[in-house]
UniProtKB/Swiss-Prot annotation:
<dbReference type="GO" id="GO:0019264">
    <property type="term" value="P:glycine biosynthetic process from serine"/>
</dbReference>
<dbReference type="GO" id="GO:0005829">
    <property type="term" value="C:cytosol"/>
</dbReference>
<dbReference type="GO" id="GO:0030170">
    <property type="term" value="F:pyridoxal phosphate binding"/>
</dbReference>
<comment type="similarity">
    <text>Belongs to the SHMT family.</text>
</comment>
<feature type="binding site">
    <location>
        <begin position="129"/>
        <end position="131"/>
    </location>
    <ligand>
        <name>(6S)-5,6,7,8-tetrahydrofolate</name>
    </ligand>
</feature>
<dbReference type="InterPro" id="IPR001085">
    <property type="entry name" value="Ser_HO-MeTrfase"/>
</dbReference>
<feature type="modified residue" description="N6-(pyridoxal phosphate)lysine">
    <location>
        <position position="234"/>
    </location>
</feature>
<dbReference type="Pfam" id="PF00464">
    <property type="entry name" value="SHMT"/>
</dbReference>
<comment type="subunit">
    <text>Homodimer.</text>
</comment>
<comment type="function">
    <text>Catalyzes the reversible interconversion of serine and glycine with tetrahydrofolate (THF) serving as the one-carbon carrier. This reaction serves as the major source of one-carbon groups required for the biosynthesis of purines, thymidylate, methionine, and other important biomolecules. Also exhibits THF-independent aldolase activity toward beta-hydroxyamino acids, producing glycine and aldehydes, via a retro-aldol mechanism.</text>
</comment>
<dbReference type="InterPro" id="IPR019798">
    <property type="entry name" value="Ser_HO-MeTrfase_PLP_BS"/>
</dbReference>
<dbReference type="GO" id="GO:0004372">
    <property type="term" value="F:glycine hydroxymethyltransferase activity"/>
</dbReference>
<dbReference type="GO" id="GO:0035999">
    <property type="term" value="P:tetrahydrofolate interconversion"/>
</dbReference>
<dbReference type="InterPro" id="IPR039429">
    <property type="entry name" value="SHMT-like_dom"/>
</dbReference>
<dbReference type="InterPro" id="IPR015424">
    <property type="entry name" value="PyrdxlP-dep_Trfase"/>
</dbReference>
<keyword id="KW-0554">One-carbon metabolism</keyword>
<keyword id="KW-0028">Amino-acid biosynthesis</keyword>
Amino acid sequence: MSNTQSFFSQSLAERDAPIRSSLLKELERQQSQVELIASENIVSRAVLEAQGSVLTNKYAEGYPGKRYYGGCEYADEVESLAIDRVKQLFNAGFANVQPHSGAQANGAVMLALTKPGDTVLGMSLDAGGHLTHGAKPALSGKWFNAMQYGVNRDTMLIDYEQVEKLAQEHKPSLIIAGFSAYPRKLDFARFRAIADSVGAKLMVDMAHIAGVIAAGRHDNPVDHAHVVTSTTHKTLRGPRGGFVLTNDEEIAKKINSAVFPGLQGGPLMHVIAGKAVAFGEALKPEFKTYIDSVLANAKALGEVLKAGGVDLVTGGTDNHLLLVDLRPKGLKGTQVEQALERAGITCNKNGIPFDTEKPTITSGIRLGTPAATTRGFGVAEFEQIGRLILEVFEALRANPDGDRATEHRVRSEIFALCDRFPIY
């Protein structure tokens, strides 16, 4: 066999055994652990196939029908399908599906609608916002005069009066609504009214709840915001990537120019193929059933935890995620994250509003139901998971460094549970 023939015929196992080994171990991890990281999900085999397709070979700078390279006929077909499907999904007039991530989508909006030094107003990271919404370590916090709003100390709900006060005082060019750890619905109409009162543009980052919105279980921000950004994974259950929506043609032109050539070069066409497949899946009736299960499972998990004496930030959830305050249990986020992983449950440590712990420690964890719901878990399974989490909590209270016997027993139950709901 010639070198050329082997290049195209050898499998990954034949060509790169160490990488193949790592991938197999990661597959086994995903198969045998309960994934409760709220920003993660499990894609369909169809999405995997699209993302692993020959489109990974293709450069396609520009947009459908206006490329800077030849040979883009089929790339155009794929991107056009992705655009049409996401517009239909969210009832939007214009869409850009090229951003490589949600952060890139947010950056493109800022490049299009603001200039360095402008004032932007977003939710603080401490209150549940995202790095890209003006946090000091991020570009948005370095290039802009970033003002941050938070939550009410008593209710832990977004303090809309504070949002309005800050907007009136600082006159931002851009107001950002969205979060990475907030379990309640957002009042997009109120955000828009505040933005209009000071002449600001409103950007909604719906990354976490895009699937919930697509299923019609949350108000659609496209009806209120000047521009909407999102990731394609999380509750949308697609590949890792981003997109931008708007109903304003002039803003759409600015967004397109900001994404390319302003922020990115060639789009990742194999990822856009995966996005198109995921958008198509989300347009099917069964996706609404899936989201209904995600929401029901989150409520069920929350009720079990509350019954076990766990404090939930805001007292519960309206979406797919729960923010757990560990202080009443005398536990830390890092400690719990590690113990749960040893027990076969993956989550992430997370700061809670007004947290006094370092971000590397935290006083909370964030839990989400999308991934485990994808593999078929229902209310009964999430109630079982809730009870197992409580067992780990109580064992940690007695043994702060971890109770290996409890963790091993819980791990055995988790393995049996996952074995009933296989993936891939």
